[in-house]
Amino acid sequence: MLFTGTLLFLSCQYSGPVEEALRQSGRNRSELERVLDFYREKGDDLSLQAAKFLISEMPGHHSLENSSLSEFRQALDTMYPQMSNVIKRVVYQVPYRKDEFVANAEKRYDLETLSADYLIAHIDNIVEMWRKCSWLKDYSFEEFCEYLLPYRFAREPLLTRFDSTTYWWQEIKARTEYYKHLPPSPMELRHFLHGIIDRQDDPYMQDFELPMSKGKHTFDCLDKCYYNLSTLRSAGIPCAIDYVPAWPTRNGTHYWWVLIDPLCMHNTYSDTQNPRAAKVLRQTYSHHPVPRPGKNEYIPEQFLNPFNKDVTAEYVKVSDVKLSFPLFRQRHAYLAVFNEMSWKPVAWAKIRGGRALFKEMGRSVVYLPVCYKKEQLCSAGNPILLKSDGSTVELNPKSERFSLTLTRKYPLTYSKTQWSRNMLDCRFEAGDDSTFRDSTVVFHISRPDPNLNYVEVFVPDSIGAFRCWRIIGPKRIWLGELAFYSKEGEKLSGRTIYHPEDKGETPENAFDNDELTYTNVYAWLGKDFERPEKVSKIRYISRTDANGIIRGMEYGLMYFDRQWFSAGRQTAVADSLVFDSLPAGALFWLRNLTEGREERIFTYDSEFDRIVYW
């Protein structure tokens, strides 16, 4: 009898990850075991393997709960009773970004709360999809588990009541069977899905009212990713969310959704691509390695999230980077990129024998090796440049000195150069009245300003006094500021005038002393001074990002030598700054100490006499 009981006990044991998950589930273990027993007794091995995958990877997955979040969801359901589940999964998470909602929120772990009935209903639906949808036959079981099977994609509250969106895959299947000669690629299937959804969810994506007087909300890139993931997987289209935790060449982060196609590496919108990324991560249901802290070692929270897969190599050329960390006793080191005017770690590695190997780092990026002392980020040397060919160069300041003229603190993009190019062929005219019937041409703009900065036009003495002055062009004029000055240097004031057919383009923005506000006026814009005025100077700026050198503002140039050092401070008296005695080979950072938040690190290329932003 004892022998028989031992056999029964052993038959209930599972492989390591499944058993560990069951152990962590506490009182909910019986619910999860009921799922496994259901498929074992049914003899459905595919569904059993799917259940084992979901349970083994379930540790750590959770939603957030407190009275405020519950009240928000109830109010949302009352306000929008027709809202589909795919939208609810997204909007239910909007309060997660507000401190007043999540300050005392409790993590509700799936292992401890999911019912057997919910999991069985979910697995039955997705496995039926897998078996019946012809377009899924080329996907591996591993891809099916990762990109279709999961019941959640983030920390959203789980919806136990299924709606019609749960079975969209059946409608997609019917359409592919009707159009038998259409190869069902993921992108083609997505077009079918658009036909099913139509525009029914559009009202919830832009400027829609939230309950509990929380204002209006417009979907950002992460919301749109969640929505697309929710809709695509409901339609039987494997997909995932990829993201850049911190851009290495500009501020911010970015999320986008990606179709998983077994016949090509990835299939995304072109505007989500960037030629330089340090790390690209994919949000997953399954676990991936995370650093294990040593005694009293601080690990940033972002690296403790096990649901991230490194997919950098699917987007950019990568190289491994091996660096020395001889002075640090921590277990882990990091590589950081410059983002939002600070160094932000994007990769980690274990220190072994005083060295750390960082795998698959994006090329053409400047990295700073760093470690943490308690929670303080500390540089572990000077920045390195991982070049496009995979080699590395340490950016060490040298004893050799040079001078540098600076006209901007942030790189241009092609689209921004169009702002100043739009000013080409515009001209300034003066006339006796606002009809400009017998106008006098004062100046013709023949070249764009390369720095998107102010341009001064000195009016010849031969030009007399006129009541009305304007800028006129062959098309719309993108203008940030426009001012007319007297011989004494005083700014002249008058009534704003513009083309009579121009409406709603806020022409006043060109005269509000703020170059970041702009107007896109039709044909022409100017001033009526009510009496003839002798103008000696015209000062204008196209639409701009205000990252040029602006007179009157204070700037500081920094260089890095294991930390930031000042190379000098100046108040701008012209549209450029000159700094002398700068160390060659260093990494620099020009700061606007008066205002602004867009600033980039750079090096100086003496061979081509140019600044290279990173």
Regions found by a protein language model. Give the residues of each.
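Short, acidic Ser/Thr/Gly-rich low-complexity loop/linker segments typical of extracellular
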Residues: 342-354, 568-572
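Edge beta-strands of extracellular beta-sandwich domains
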Residues: 375-396, 480-481, 597-607
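Disordered, acidic Ser/Thr/Pro-rich linker "stalks" and the adjacent N-terminal cap
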Residues: 401-465, 476-550, 555, 596-614
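A short, amphipathic beta-strand motif
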Residues: 317-327, 406-410, 414
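Extracellular beta-sheet/turn segments enriched in Thr/Pro/Gly and aliphatic residues
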Residues: 304-312, 382-408, 608-614
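Hydrophobic/aromatic-rich core segments of domains that either
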Residues: 17-26, 40-42, 175-192, 201-211, ...
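Secondary-structure boundary elements
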Residues: 33-34, 42-216, 252
